[in-house]
């Protein structure tokens, strides 16, 4: 079966999301080993700041007079962690968010709203920041009712798999209403199970039916 027309229809509705994370580490001044390698020899706390990037996906769900709106996962859009080890403590939080459209154009995005319990977030990009050619290349997704999904129907997943850009995978709906308890926040959610390949970076991406909805 040829799904090229379906892919061509849906790819413009999906974006890649880059979360730029700022990590600040502070050494424990009392750690002789850490101070030996990273300190100033005076047994004082040392602070360093670095940046890293995390990748995910999003789906274009609306356009206002001023903004383009995209839905993604909370854990893709928001990063906020603190921790301690024997040698240092650290904080890591989102510094900025960027989205990349189907034509490769990358622009800064703002967090419009988020719900960590539902693991959902909405990003917004100013229309004035998007080139006209890009606006003509992208489109808004059609959202259908998940209550109408049936076991066995075909699906196409699109996302920024492994942070390497948009990828399409195909499969079927394997089961519905699966109660799954997540390991990170111990929240139980009712899930749809599919057998299309889903990789790191697909989070927040689109799952489309045969009509491209």
Q: For each of these PLM feature ranges, what is it?
A:
Residues 1-213:
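Serine-dependent protease modules
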């Amino acid at each position: 079966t040829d799904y090229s027309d379906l892919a061509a229809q849906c790819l413009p509705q999906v974006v890649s999301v880059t979360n730029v994370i700022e990590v600040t580490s502070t050494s424990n001044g009392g750690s002789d080993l850490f101070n030996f390698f990273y300190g100033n020899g005076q047994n004082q706390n040392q602070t360093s700041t670095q940046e890293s990037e995390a990748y995910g996906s999003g789906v274009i769900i609306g356009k206002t007079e001023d903004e383009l709106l995209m839905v993604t996962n909370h854990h893709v859009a928001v990063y906020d962690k603190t921790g301690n080890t024997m040698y240092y403590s650290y904080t890591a939080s989102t510094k900025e968010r960027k989205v990349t459209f189907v034509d490769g154009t990358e622009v800064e995005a703002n967090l419009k709203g988020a719900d960590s319990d539902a693991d959902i977030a909405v990003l917004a990009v100013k229309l004035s920041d998007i080139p006209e050619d890009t606006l003509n290349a992208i489109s808004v997704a059609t959202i259908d009712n998940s209550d109408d999904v049936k076991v066995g129907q075909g699906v196409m997943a699109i996302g920024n798999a492994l942070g390497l850009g948009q990828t399409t995978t195909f499969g079927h709906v394997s089961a519905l209403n699966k109660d799954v308890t997540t390991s990170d926040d111990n929240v139980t959610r009712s899930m749809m199970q599919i057998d299309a390949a889903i990789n790191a970076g697909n989070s927040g991406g689109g799952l489309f039916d045969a009509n491209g909805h």
